[in-house]
Amino acid sequence: MKTALTIAGSDSSGGAGIQADIKTMTANGVYAMSAITALTAQNTTGVTGIFEATPEFLAQEIDAIFTDIYPDAVKIGMVSSAELIGVIAEKLRSYDAKHIVVAEVVTPNIPEAEILSGMKITDAAGMEAAAQRISEKYHCAVLCKGGHQINDADDLLWRNGCGKWFRGRRIDNPNTHGTGCTLSSAIASNLAKGYDLDASVE
């Protein structure tokens, strides 16, 4: 069985974070493992508290996984400090980790893509320009998610200087807590199973 590691925060409501990641990876037929960056008190209406893991403990979590069950893919979610990011980067480099969702591909929604690109996005052309800028700046593929009122939930994958649209249909449902975690975990699961990035996104 293929394996996938999620490095992210814990969601006490189970709708996002580590809990959503593990559910998604399991549903996609891979063995899920986790390294928790923070405990959060949250639900569908917001976050009321965060208790961050220490850098030393996060390093121990990652070591425990890589020295026993080497993951076929890694998904990185919520990381709340630069110090923890440094630990993750150092450990993944030292273990020569493969298929890292957030290093190989980032999955920003529209507000996140605006921050990463420094551009205002109001239409599909804006998504393309922002995705291109992010890809060039961070040297990775970008899956820009269009569900924030820009279109009918069409997503854009930008890689190697080219864009590919994945057409979606907006679902009329306010329960969207954790959808980004679920999508990135599904992509990581498919990468772990050997699919290329386009097929993993589709």
Labelled PLM ranges:
Residues G46-E52, S117-T122, D172:
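Short glycine-enriched, charge-decorated loop/helix-capping segments at active-site entrances
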Residues Y95, A103-G163, D198:
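Conserved phosphate/ATP/ADP-binding segment of small-molecule kinases
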Residues K2-T6, I22-V101:
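Conserved N-terminal subdomain of the carbohydrate kinase-like
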Residues I7-S13, G163-G178:
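Short pre-catalytic strand/loop immediately N-terminal to key active-site residues, enriched for Gly-Thr
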Residues L39-T40, M78-S80, E112, G147-I150, ...:
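Glycine-rich beta-alpha junction loops
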Residues S10, I76-G77, K145, T176:
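Glycine- and other small-residue-rich loops at beta-strand/loop junctions that grip anionic moieties
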Residues Q19, E114-I115, N173-L197, V201:
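Short, small-residue alpha-helix embedded
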